[in-house]
């Protein structure tokens, strides 16, 4: 079990706009990380077959507990899409901040029917193919006050599993790693930029009534602001990755002793051989961005994927 409190976190301090300068850095926040770590292992053999397995699993609950006497939240990482992350007392730090979507308007009648209790249009600038945004606070107006927590970039669970097998000179080892209960804000899916190649999910865009209820129509600009920070950009970033796999064979000593070699082993090794994930970006293991305050954890601005490498080698003992 662990319970770690961090005090005096360095954060950009909020200042009024009339200050005329960028926000200074100060010891502003307190945070608590609590959880449990489990470490299990077992080794055994069946005749000439030896085996060993080890499991490491850790659960972490992260919570911001203090932001100063006069503050309960702080805006963190921002982007052309808007504020992407936020720090708020009583919630994970940081968390993704934005609007919730409820599908895509299929026709003009659906736009006209999306009204508040007084009959006013909730999204007067929308048209068929645009996102339907949720009136989270129920005040009959969709505005900045409807932004809410839409995910987080810090995993609940982190796991590692290692396996070792040996049989008559052959050996095999494998290390799997994974994380669960985590999301990524995939900015690389943007389709509102005319000077870059478009992601393949543009092929799934809304093209007419009934074509999709998940992807909006394609347009570089939208009066409905389809590309604002919302749960549309947030994806499940859970994964299991084969971090390392190695297969080897040790020649019998009776074959190598004639050339003054006590042990000779041949092996082939693969790193990052495969990754099991639903994430559509290059790499679900998104750790952070260009912020020095740790406020971009989970924001994928186009991270460079981890290389898949293959190695062939020989171990020789004289």
Labelled PLM ranges:
Residues 1-20, 49-52, 58, 62:
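Membrane-embedded beta-barrel scaffold of Gram-negative outer-membrane proteins
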Residues 12-22, 77, 137-144, 218-230, ...:
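Flexible, solvent-exposed coil segments and beta strand-coil junctions
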Residues 26-30, 45-151, 271, 278:
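Conserved small-residue
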Residues 120, 179-271:
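Extracytoplasmic gating/loop element in the C-terminal half of outer-membrane beta-barrel translocons
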Residues 23, 32-37, 50, 156-160, ...:
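Transmembrane beta-barrel architecture of outer-membrane proteins
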Residues 25-33, 75-106, 205-215, 225-227, ...:
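C-terminal beta-signal and terminal closure region of outer-membrane beta-barrel proteins
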Residues 1-6, 42-44, 57-63, 167-169, ...:
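Transmembrane beta-strands of outer-membrane beta-barrel pores
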Residues 38-42, 161-167, 174, 245-251, ...:
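Residues on the lipid-exposed face of transmembrane beta-strands in outer-membrane beta-barrel proteins
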